[in-house]
Amino acid sequence: MKKQSIYLLMLTVILLMGCNQDAPKYIIGVSQCSVDIWHDWQNAEMKTEANFHEGIELRFADANSDPEVQSKQIDSLVASGINLLIVTPNQLSSSSPAIDRAHDKGIPVIVFERKTESRKYTAFVSADNYEMGHMMGEYIASRLGGKGNIIEVMGPKGSKPAEERYNGFHVAIADYPDIKVVAEIEGDWTEDTAYETVKKWEGDLNTVDAVFGHNDRSALGARKAFKERGARMPLLCGIDALPGPDGGIHKVAEGQLDASYIYPTRGDELIKLAIAILDGDRYPKETMLSSALVTHDNAMVLQLGSDEVVRMTQNLNKLQAKANGYKQQIATQQTVWILVGVSAVLLLLSIVLAILYFRSKRLAQKQS
């Protein structure tokens, strides 16, 4: 009886300690096709927004631009027990089957930026990549006066955003017969690759009047190549216009880029949408995010606003970290008090059992 009572109390302690740990209400898996400044900012926005909601756990996976890796990571996230999947697909031909498998298992899927081939998703969020390319084409044509040579540093083959930006750009400049794209260079969204490929281009960089990078890092990599080869600096335009000291807004304000186009990350909206889906609330099936051109004319104003957003986000994250620390301290204190209480009960039970044992022993001796 003594051992059974002790085991029962130990089980009670374990259960109480388990109850003391708050289980997440929702587990949201995030599958990013690559790691870069743009996706880092989106992840940070998701983390900040999740802090405003009780019981949200985020699980991130980064495929480092490898579609096969992303497919495996999606399957792994699903197997880990997530309640919803947010995914930015790499190459749709490779990623779509894994997304379909998640959807077929009843897991809601939010697809960002690229629609899957099967359309098996719960919601889709993106900006208009075709419009971005078209607007950049019009802007560059206007700045060049309808005449000049352009190097285009594209995104990787198979990338839907790169394809749409390319199409929009070329439709825009088709109206200007004296504008020539003298080189179409495939990149991978990184500054280093753009730098290496532009530097190795066999043409005369001094004949180039403009560079259109499919993102800001590509345009900045081209800028580095022009500078290293001692060539005349062309008009430099990209897409993303992220906030922060390394973002495109700052680069335009500082004069390193001539223009960029805001490609909104909106990680906060993705989390809000995810919670609405999980809570059973009404939500839009498709959301198109608004964007805008950033030039020297508006970059300083946008920079001031974006700097304030960055500062507030950092402060909120610090406050959340402190709050989590206090919460953990309280949970630890509660656990300690539970252990003290149970220890006291165990001690009291041991005393009672000892008294009963000696009484029964004494009674047995008298009877004998």
Please annotate each region the language model reported:
Residues C19, K157, P161, A172-I173, ...:
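Hinge/cleft segment of the Venus flytrap/periplasmic-binding protein
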